[in-house]
Design a protein with these regions (language model features):
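Macromolecular interaction modules
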Residues: 1-109
């Protein structure tokens, strides 16, 4: 399994509008990626930790799953990817950093 992560680290004046747009508009484009298995959206969740840790500042983390690196490469070179990149300019306001990363997953338990 290969996952492609897109991390939105920062803030939006309206996180709800950003997430709604992503789910209702952008996800429909991502669904057109060849051989995509799933799209999982991760949002911040309240949590407590008895130890001092550095908290992240991720507003939204999108995880797209593929069976192989070859499937991911096909998706990244597809017309749907170009449409997704164009759609990014229509997102609600967001200030921060967007990073992209592919990782191979291994289920341990």
């Amino acid at each position: 399994m290969v996952s492609y992560f897109v991390r939105y680290r920062g803030a939006s004046p309206s996180p709800e509008a950003f997430e709604t747009y992503y789910e209702s508009q952008h996800a429909a484009i991502l669904k057109q990626f060849p051989n995509i298995r799933s799209l999982i959206l991760h949002r911040p969740s309240p949590w407590t930790d008895p130890f001092r840790v550095r908290r992240g500042e991720t507003m939204l983390l999108a995880q797209m799953r593929f069976d192989s690196a070859n499937d991911l490469d096909k998706a990244l070179h597809s017309q749907a990817r170009r449409l997704a990149r164009d759609d990014f300019h229509r997102f609600p306001p967001f200030e921060g950093e967007v990073t992209h990363e592919a990782m191979t997953g291994k289920v341990i338990f």
